[in-house]
Amino acid sequence: MLDILTFYTYFVNPTDQGASPIITNLRILITGSNSGFGLLTSLTLARQGHHVIATMRDLDKGAALAATAEAEKLPIEMRTLDVCDPASVEAALADAATIDVLINNAGFEVQGGLEMVDDELMQKQLDTNVIGPLRTIRAVMPAWRRRQSGAIVNVSSTVGIVATPYGGAYSASKFALEGMSEALYMEAKPDNIRVHLIEPGRFSTTNFGSNIVRPDGWVGSELENRQIAFRKALSNLDGKAPPDPQSVADAIVNAAIDPAAPFRNLVGDDAVMLASAYKAAPTYEDFEAGIRERLDWHI
C-alpha cells in the first residue's frame, strides 16, 4: 500500500520529480477561458510571455479577459470553441501543428441527488466534461505525433478520485476523465507528448455559480437539505474558507510549461487529505466512516 508520505511526494510535489528546464514562449490553447480557472490561467500564462489562445463558446462572455489583455498588452488571442460541437472544435484547432499545449478546462457541474438527474442532463454532463476533451485531444494528436512533441493538461477534480454525495453525475464525468487521461499518458509517451491531470479540492471563485446546474425538483428537497449539511461539514476540514483559486491556475501553468511536472497534481489541503485517506483506507467502508468522523457529519 502506498504510504501517505510517498503519496504526497509522487502526486503533489513536482519539485521531487527531477529538475528540467522550464519551456518559454509557448503557444497554448485553453478551453473555457472566459471565467474561473480558465480566466486566471490565461492571464497568468500571458503575463509570463506565452501566446495564449483563449477559447470559449461565446466571445461576448470574454469581455473581461479581452479588456485586461488590451490594457496590459498581453499576447492573448480569442477564439470561439464549443467543446460539444465537433465542427467548432475542428475549426478552432485547425492549426494544431502550431500549438504546443492544450489545456482542457471547459466544463460544468451537475449538483443534485443522483436519482434526480435525468438522461438528458447526464448526457450533457458527459458530453461537456468527457467527450469534449476527447474531441480536442483527437484534433491535436495526429499533428503532435508527427512532430513528436506536445502537452495536454486536463483539469479534473478531487471528486475524480473519490466521489462525494450529491454530486454523482459530476464525479462520474471526472472519473471518466481520469481514466481517459491515464490511458492517454501511456499511449502518448512514446511520441514525447506529455499528459497531466489537475485535481483541485474545494475552491471558490465569484464566476463559478453559472457553471453549476441543478436538476428539476432539487431546490427545497430533502436531499438538498442533506447536501447543505454536508457542505457545512466540509468546513471542518481546516476551519477556513476555501483557498485562493490562483493556486489552481498556478498548478495548471506549471504542468503546461514544466516537463518535470508530475502526471497528477492535487491542489488544496483538502484534496491531499481526501485522496490520501482514500488511498490509505483498507476498505471503502473504512474510508467512509473515517470521513464522517473527521467532518463530524452524521446525516
Regions found by a protein language model. Give the residues of each.
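Conserved glycine-rich cofactor-binding loop
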Residues: 34-35
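The beta1-alpha1 cofactor-binding region of Rossmann-like NAD(H)/NADP(H)-dependent oxidoreductases
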Residues: 80-91, 119
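Substrate-binding pocket helix/loop in short-chain dehydrogenase/reductase
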Residues: 113-114, 121-123
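Active-site helix of classical SDR
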Residues: 137, 173
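Residue(s) in the substrate-gating loop at a strand-loop-helix junction
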Residues: 157
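Active-site-adjacent segment of SDR/Rossmann-fold oxidoreductases
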Residues: 162, 183-194
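SDR active-site lid
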Residues: 190-262
